[in-house]
Structures are given as structure tokens and as C-alpha cells.
Amino acid sequence: GLACACALAAGGAWGAPERPKKDVEVVAVYYPHWHKYPKGTEWFGAKWDAGEWDFVKTARALFPGHKQPLRPYPGYLDGADPKDMETEIALAANAGIDVFLWDYYWYGGKVTQEESIEKAFLKARNRGRMKFALMWCYHERNNQFRPHLEPSRQALMTLDHTPEEFLGLIDHSIARYFNQPEYWRKDGKLFF
């Protein structure tokens, strides 16, 4: 996903020097499901073991000239592995990306699909090269990956937040993320 675009933009320069400060910050939305996670196995079965990469690997051409499946450079990185996250951070930072804006899911009063930020980003040795922020994905989690293009989409997780659950989201974010030195701020204010 993200690593592919960053590697191409960086020309494969993994060890490029730090970039000078600039007036404009470049933000990349980080979709956090490029790894195995419990809900994915629950939704799509035990064979679904590489996260969204399973969909990439099984992509089929839909028309002449549509080249599928494609293999990402530098490979199928595990979004929950700190070493793979270090690669993504290096690729992104070297390509001029300043901030990962994390898709952040909160359903039923608790955070879900947080493995990439908890197990990888916060444990990456080079995380100081990349700011991050949370973008609360306030939508139903639907099955976007249907084998046919019919319009119906099964709701995998529904929105039924109570005010107390929303406050739980804020409390969790304050306690776990907003105090991190890499958490992105604009004009001294937290971005959420």
C-alpha cells in the first residue's frame, strides 16, 4: 500500500538524509490493515491470514490491459511488525511525507484494528522521523471486498455509539496517543 507509492517517489533511496524543514507538511492517510487481525479472520475465514494483502494477491483483471495482481515494492510488508514499519517510515520520510494520518476505528466502546499503530509504529526504532495523528473513521465498517460488483454491502461493524462510548474514545486517545512526542500538532494544537 503506502510503502509502494513512497518507494517509487523516493526512487528507492532508503538511506537518504533527513529532509530540511519546510513550510508545507505532507500528510498520508494510513490504512492500518495490512496484517492479520482477529476481526478479519472472523469476517473472512481462517485462510485470510495476511490482512488486506490477501485481496491484493487474489486480484483479477477486469478488462483487457488491466494488469492484476500486482506485487508491491518492497514486498508484502506486515503492518503489525515493527521492522516492516521501520521500512515504511524510512520510505515515506525519504519521499517527503511528514505525517501518517491513521484510520482509527472505535466500535462498541473500544478501539479495534489497532495492531499496526500499537504493535508496529509505537515500537519502530525510527518513529521519530514520522509524526502521526488519528482520524476517527466514523462510519459503518462494510464489506467492501465482494467477489462481484453488486451494490449490497454487508455491515461488519455498525455505528451505535453512546455519548459515554464517545467519551471513552477521547479518554483512550488522550491516555495512549496524544501524549506521544510524535503526535502531530498544528499551531501547537493536537490534530484529531
Residue spans for each PLM region:
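Bacterial N-terminal signal peptides
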Residues: 1-9
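Boundary at the C-terminal end of the N-terminal hydrophobic targeting segment
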Residues: 9-15
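Glycan-processing catalytic domains of CAZymes
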Residues: 17-192
